[in-house]
Amino acid sequence: LRSRGLGDVYKRQAVNNTPDGREGMALGQYIAGMGFSNVGLGIVHSMAHPLGALYDTPHGVANAIILPTVMEYNAPATGDKYKYIAQAMGVEETENMTQEEYRKAAVDAVRKLSQDVGIPADLKEIVKPEDVDFLAQSAFDDACRPGNPRETSVAEIAELYRSLM
């Protein structure tokens, strides 16, 4: 979460190519790498990998497009973790929110950050509908999938891709 907070502070500056922004993002990426090397990743990365392989979509862009949708999908399996994500993203008053409210606030904050830095909101310009089944099977078979907090299936992953088109 520390890296998420740094990203929120510095990502907008990094997109504008400021030295402080680039330095802050480098630190945030380093801290995030230490975190996910201990706990694994999930279907956000599993779904992003075949987009890079099939369409040459940059991995970070693919992750940013997919993340809010997968956050919504995973929400029932996350306990109170989204409260801390919302706080790290600058959402105030999370202590006075219901679980549903802070989960939505966390997802909305991630979407807003992506929008602010010019990340596309969906996969319409990237994914061909006829490739969805292949993408879903590839994501399901990906080494990152077992780290997802919620069990999933090929059909559910395919539906997540379709919801982004």
Residue ranges and their predicted role:
Residues R12-G24, K83-G90, T94-E101:
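C-terminal helix-coil-helix/basic helical segment that borders enzyme active sites and/or dimer interfaces
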Residues G24-L27, S46-H49, I65, Y84, ...:
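Amphipathic alpha-helical interaction segments
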Residues L1-Y10:
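Single conserved hydrophobic/aromatic residue that forms the stacking wall/gate
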Residues P50-M89:
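Catalytic phosphate/nucleotide-handling subdomain of diverse soluble enzymes
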Residues Y82, E92-M165:
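C-terminal charged capping/lid subdomain of soluble metabolic enzymes
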Residues D8, Q29-G33, M47, L51, ...:
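Buried hydrophobic packing segments
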Residues K11-M47:
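Oxyanion-binding "anion nests"
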